[in-house]
From Swiss-Prot:
GO molecular function, one term: tetrahydrodipicolinate N-acetyltransferase activity
Name of the protein this chain belongs to: 2,3,4,5-tetrahydropyridine-2,6-dicarboxylate N-acetyltransferase
Role: Catalyzes the transfer of an acetyl group from acetyl-CoA to tetrahydrodipicolinate.
Gene: dapH
Pathway connected to this protein: Amino-acid biosynthesis; L-lysine biosynthesis via DAP pathway; LL-2,6-diaminopimelate from (S)-tetrahydrodipicolinate (acetylase route): step 1/3
Pfam family, one: Hexapep_2
Domain of life, source organism: Bacteria
CDD domains named in the record: LbH_THP_succinylT
Family named by the database record: Belongs to the transferase hexapeptide repeat family. DapH subfamily.
Catalytic activity as recorded in UniProt: (S)-2,3,4,5-tetrahydrodipicolinate + acetyl-CoA + H2O = L-2-acetamido-6-oxoheptanedioate + CoA
């Protein structure tokens, strides 16, 4: 598995990060003689602009030029944000619209991240792993290869408190919808976690667990192959 960022490294990263409140400003007015700050990204025509800038910079600009503005609309989706979303340009995986993946998360080759899934800082999505709709990988949670994390499932994060151990999901594990894997739990290779299970202790390799708290109910060898199949076609990309 890929090496984790430590909790202290993540905490330091967040602490040191320049906090950002980016704005998207739609503005009409008389800007013929206006010089926009170099930090602004400005698009549009002479009398109608779209501006990308920081909130504090816009405030100063507006105070100096508000008399020239006839119409104004501002979009703001975060405040003093420390961690931007991950740049996915070089990510060799299938990422669907509406997935939230933060910087310093790792998405390995052939992974699939579905709509509404959230991957926090320091989390690792292993090769060929699928994170289904609205599932959450908390800080430093790790999956191995060819794992399926079902819709709405939660792998708890462990940035705070920093002493906690991260969730680790080994290769070829199936996690059912709305299951919760608590901090420090390790799920062994080939195991199955039933839908809605609350997993509070390590799961042995090849075991099937269910319930609240989750307990071993049988072995995966007793489960039909068709019910635990990982479908490679769902992970196929255009370059394959």
């Amino acid at each position: 598995m890929v090496q984790h960022l430590s909790a202290q490294e993540i905490i330091q990263y967040i602490s040191d990060a320049k906090k950002s409140t980016p704005l998207k400003v739609y503005v009409n007015g008389h800007f013929e003689n206006v010089t926009f700050p170099e930090s602004f990204k400005v698009f549009g025509s002479e009398h109608s602009k779209v501006i990308f800038c920081e909130a504090n910079e816009w405030k100063q600009f507006y105070q100096q030029n508000h008399s020239l503005i006839t119409e104004l609309e501002i979009e703001m989706d975060r405040r003093n944000s420390a961690i931007p979303l991950k740049d996915l340009t070089n990510t060799n995986a299938r990422i669907e619209p509406g997935a939230f993946i933060r910087e310093q998360a790792i998405i390995e080759d052939g992974a699939v991240v579905m709509m509404g899934a959230t991957i926090n800082i320091g989390a690792i999505v292993g090769e060929g792993t699928m994170i289904d709709m609205n599932a959450t990988l908390g800080g430093r949670a790790t999956t191995g290869k060819n794992v399926h994390v079902g819709a709405g499932a939660v792998l708890a994060g462990v940035i705070e408190p920093p002493s906690a151990s991260p969730v680790v999901i080994e290769d070829n594990v199936l996690i059912g919808a709305n299951a919760v894997i608590l901090e420090g739990v390790r799920v062994g290779a080939g195991a199955i976690v039933a839908a809605g299970a609350i997993v509070t202790q390590d799961v042995p390799a090849g075991a099937v667990v269910a319930g609240t708290p989750a307990k071993v109910i049988k072995q995966t060898s007793e489960v039909q192959d068709s019910k635990r199949e990982i479908v490679s076609a769902l992970r196929k990309l255009n370059n394959e």
